[in-house]
Amino acid sequence: MRPERLTVRNFLGLKNVDIEFQSGITVVEGPNGAGKSSLFEAISFALFGNGIRYPNSYDYVNRNAVDGTARLVFQFERGGKRYEIIREINALQRKHNAKLSEILENGKKAAIAAKPTSVKQEVEKILGIEHRTFIRTVFLPQGEIDKLLISPPSEITEIISDVFQSKETLEKLEKLLKEKMKKLENEISSLQALYTAIWKYLEENDLEVLKSELKTVSEKKKELLKKREELQKEEEQLKRLLEKYRELVKKKERLRVLSLRRNELQKEVIYEQKVKKAKELEPLFREIYLRQREFERFSQELNSREKRYKELESEKEAISKEIPVHRERLSKLEEIGEKIKEELDLLEKVLKASRPLLEQRIRLKENLTRLEEEFRRLVGEKEKREKELLSIEKTENETKNELEKLLDELSILKKDHMKWLAYQIASSLNEGDTCPVCGGVFHGKVEAVEFNIDEFEKLDQKRSELENTLNVLKERKKSLSSLIEDLLMKIEEGKKNLKSIRNQIEKIEEELHRLGYSEDLEEKLDEKRKKLRKIEEERHSISQKITAADVQISQIENQLKEIKGEIEAKRETLKEQREEMDQLKSDFFDRLRKIGIGFEEFRILVKEEVKDAEKELGVVETEIRLLEESLKELESENVRDVSEDYEKVRNQLEALSQEISDLERKEGRLNHLIEETLRRERELKSLEKKLKEMSDEYNNLDLLRKYLFDKSNFSRYFTGRVLEAVLKRTKAYLDILTNGRFDIDFDDEKGGFIIKDWGIERPARGLSGGERALISISLAMSLAEVASGRLDAFFIDEGFSSLDTENKEKIASVLKELERLNKVIVFITHDREFSEAFDRKLRITGGVVVNE
């Protein structure tokens, strides 16, 4: 992974940083607490969504971020492809957004993942390592630059195990292995139980015995099938005889029923003759009925027209009485209308004279409303700013108190800091070395000093932040005081303007009162106009009513004349219809007397349906004749009842079929048992094979468990293989960086790593500061590449401030050789003198890059 660019906003101590990485060495320099060490954490968080210090992602947001949001943009190259990651962490809303894209050759971006979890998974696929391995290989923390180089063999084994075999990973692996073995134990136990059950089943069900029993059952079934076939033939013969007997009985019964029906039909034929004669008179009866209905309809119409004639005469009389009343109301409305018009003219003159004053009053009231709103706004703004000023004063006092406590705490820590710096310088000196501080010769043993430098830098950073906060609060306080004074002046000016406008409005209202204007003048005008319109509408309506009444009387007179003619014509028609109907009734009753039927009997007969009983009688007599002939033929064959013989044979057949069915079920059960026995024999062989395979697998896993978690065996073997790969890479780096001067090897008996200087062995602790740093970095990079593949970037957090100027220059000149590796190498230091030795450097102060 080769970093290209990192943009950071409000992440830990970094407020606003934009860095472009280049091949070679870059030195990041700045005071303690400036945010230098946060650069690597920003890269780690951008890639994996995890830092190093805190488990909670929202703790990485800078506490002074106004919007509570941290933003990271990281561009890098891997395997010939370029990628970009964008992450935003909002601590206020508890939101974490992430997006991973590939940067294409045309500059466009193709999205790969858009959620924190999926981005982390895709990054792990691209880099081929997880977060834990990344932070243990790509980053060399403060104070550990030569830890691996000078450690004894036991510690080297622990360091390698920590990188490649974390305790958590081994515990997880051991747990999985135990679960797998437990699962295998359960499966083997289940299979063994199944094996025992199958073996028991095969012992209980002997295959040869089952086959012999099946043969006996099949032979017996064959005999019974033959016997059933003979009985079925006998049953068929008896069935035919029984059917003939039943046919004879059935025909005799049918003959008896038909004889009775023939007697009934003979009576029905006589009755139907009367019905037919009655139906011949039905058309005449219908005509009389229709003539009667027509006569009644005409009578009703005549009564209706006579009634309508009387109604029209009454309606004409009522309308004639309404017309004089309408004319009197019309005259009164004309008088009222003239009076309202005079009142309306007077009110319109007053309104016309008042209109200029009214328009002026409206404009003044609008200005008054606008000024009142502005006045209220200014008063509200003043109160708001006064509250804000009180809040700032409170915050200022709290910040001062916090700063005083912090300064007291820092004063105590600074004394321990000086002791710790002295210890750091002394611990790097050997017996007889020149002290870089006093220039004297170093003698004696170094006494260890414990000091939490991270806590000291954190408190110092907090002090700087509190001082900046106090300055900001003072400026804001001054600005608010000035703003409140301006608001007070504007409020006084607003009061004067409001009073002036209210006086002008009062004078205009006095003048309007003098003219006779009142606030409801326009309402009175509208009311008068509405009354006038209402009177005009009523006058128009009454005029229309008078005209309509005259027209209505004329129409009624025409209708009366027309209805009178209709009444006379209908009376003449009714007289003619009565004479014709009397003649038809006389003819009808004469014909009824001739055929010997009374009127009531006629009404019953005419409703009857003619069923043609005479035709049915012929059919019945024909069927009786045919049945008598058929019965003679059957009686000549001596047909008898064989139902008892038939039932006896059927019962024998049913019993035989049941026995055959029982044998078939037994035959099926035996076939199933034989198939099941054969299947279980095959299953038994398969189980024997599977049990052997699973037992072998269990033994292999048990062997793996014994060797994998035995530190005396596996760890020594694993460390040896890793060291072979690490030393091979380190030798190659040293050959390039020192032109073949230095070589490195590992000897467990000689206490760890052995350095060869032009072939002469030297202990690692005997190297100069620059030589040791160069070899340590080469060794650390080699270990990182073995763990994570090809390594194109390396970050080193190491201070060299304890060295004098000459030693710093020596170390810097040696470390410059790392430029030849064509990698991105970043040194993080708070020593400006050390950083000046390098061409490319960044200075970070207060969380921002101040120069490049």
UniProtKB/Swiss-Prot annotation:
<feature type="binding site">
    <location>
        <position position="61"/>
    </location>
    <ligand>
        <name>ATP</name>
    </ligand>
</feature>
<keyword id="KW-0547">Nucleotide-binding</keyword>
<dbReference type="GO" id="GO:0006302">
    <property type="term" value="P:double-strand break repair"/>
</dbReference>
<comment type="subunit">
    <text>Homodimer. Forms a complex with Mre11.</text>
</comment>
<dbReference type="InterPro" id="IPR029012">
    <property type="entry name" value="Helix_hairpin_bin_sf"/>
</dbReference>
<dbReference type="GO" id="GO:0004529">
    <property type="term" value="F:DNA exonuclease activity"/>
</dbReference>
<feature type="binding site">
    <location>
        <position position="37"/>
    </location>
    <ligand>
        <name>Mg(2+)</name>
    </ligand>
</feature>
<feature type="binding site">
    <location>
        <position position="37"/>
    </location>
    <ligand>
        <name>ATP</name>
    </ligand>
</feature>
<dbReference type="GO" id="GO:0016887">
    <property type="term" value="F:ATP hydrolysis activity"/>
</dbReference>
<feature type="coiled-coil region">
    <location>
        <begin position="534"/>
        <end position="711"/>
    </location>
</feature>
<feature type="binding site">
    <location>
        <position position="435"/>
    </location>
    <ligand>
        <name>Zn(2+)</name>
    </ligand>
</feature>
<feature type="binding site">
    <location>
        <position position="59"/>
    </location>
    <ligand>
        <name>ATP</name>
    </ligand>
</feature>
<comment type="function">
    <text>Involved in DNA double-strand break repair (DSBR). The Rad50/Mre11 complex possesses single-strand endonuclease activity and ATP-dependent double-strand-specific 3'-5' exonuclease activity. Rad50 provides an ATP-dependent control of Mre11 by positioning DNA ends into the Mre11 active site: ATP-binding induces a large structural change from an open form with accessible Mre11 nuclease sites into a closed form.</text>
</comment>
<dbReference type="InterPro" id="IPR038729">
    <property type="entry name" value="Rad50/SbcC_AAA"/>
</dbReference>
<dbReference type="GO" id="GO:0046872">
    <property type="term" value="F:metal ion binding"/>
</dbReference>
<keyword id="KW-0378">Hydrolase</keyword>
<feature type="binding site">
    <location>
        <position position="36"/>
    </location>
    <ligand>
        <name>ATP</name>
    </ligand>
</feature>
<feature type="coiled-coil region">
    <location>
        <begin position="155"/>
        <end position="345"/>
    </location>
</feature>
<feature type="binding site">
    <location>
        <position position="53"/>
    </location>
    <ligand>
        <name>ATP</name>
    </ligand>
</feature>
<feature type="binding site">
    <location>
        <position position="35"/>
    </location>
    <ligand>
        <name>ATP</name>
    </ligand>
</feature>
<protein>
    <recommendedName>
        <fullName>DNA double-strand break repair Rad50 ATPase</fullName>
        <ecNumber>3.6.-.-</ecNumber>
    </recommendedName>
</protein>
<feature type="binding site">
    <location>
        <position position="54"/>
    </location>
    <ligand>
        <name>ATP</name>
    </ligand>
</feature>
<dbReference type="GO" id="GO:0003677">
    <property type="term" value="F:DNA binding"/>
</dbReference>
<dbReference type="GO" id="GO:0005524">
    <property type="term" value="F:ATP binding"/>
</dbReference>
<dbReference type="Pfam" id="PF13476">
    <property type="entry name" value="AAA_23"/>
</dbReference>
<dbReference type="GO" id="GO:0006281">
    <property type="term" value="P:DNA repair"/>
</dbReference>
<feature type="binding site">
    <location>
        <position position="38"/>
    </location>
    <ligand>
        <name>ATP</name>
    </ligand>
</feature>
<keyword id="KW-0862">Zinc</keyword>
<feature type="coiled-coil region">
    <location>
        <begin position="389"/>
        <end position="427"/>
    </location>
</feature>
<keyword id="KW-0175">Coiled coil</keyword>
<dbReference type="InterPro" id="IPR027417">
    <property type="entry name" value="P-loop_NTPase"/>
</dbReference>
<dbReference type="InterPro" id="IPR013134">
    <property type="entry name" value="Zn_hook_RAD50"/>
</dbReference>
<feature type="binding site">
    <location>
        <position position="32"/>
    </location>
    <ligand>
        <name>ATP</name>
    </ligand>
</feature>
<feature type="binding site">
    <location>
        <position position="142"/>
    </location>
    <ligand>
        <name>Mg(2+)</name>
    </ligand>
</feature>
<dbReference type="GO" id="GO:1990391">
    <property type="term" value="C:DNA repair complex"/>
</dbReference>
<feature type="domain" description="Zinc-hook">
    <location>
        <begin position="389"/>
        <end position="488"/>
    </location>
</feature>
<feature type="coiled-coil region">
    <location>
        <begin position="460"/>
        <end position="488"/>
    </location>
</feature>
<comment type="similarity">
    <text>Belongs to the SMC family. RAD50 subfamily.</text>
</comment>
<keyword id="KW-0234">DNA repair</keyword>
<keyword id="KW-0227">DNA damage</keyword>
<feature type="binding site">
    <location>
        <position position="63"/>
    </location>
    <ligand>
        <name>ATP</name>
    </ligand>
</feature>
<keyword id="KW-0067">ATP-binding</keyword>
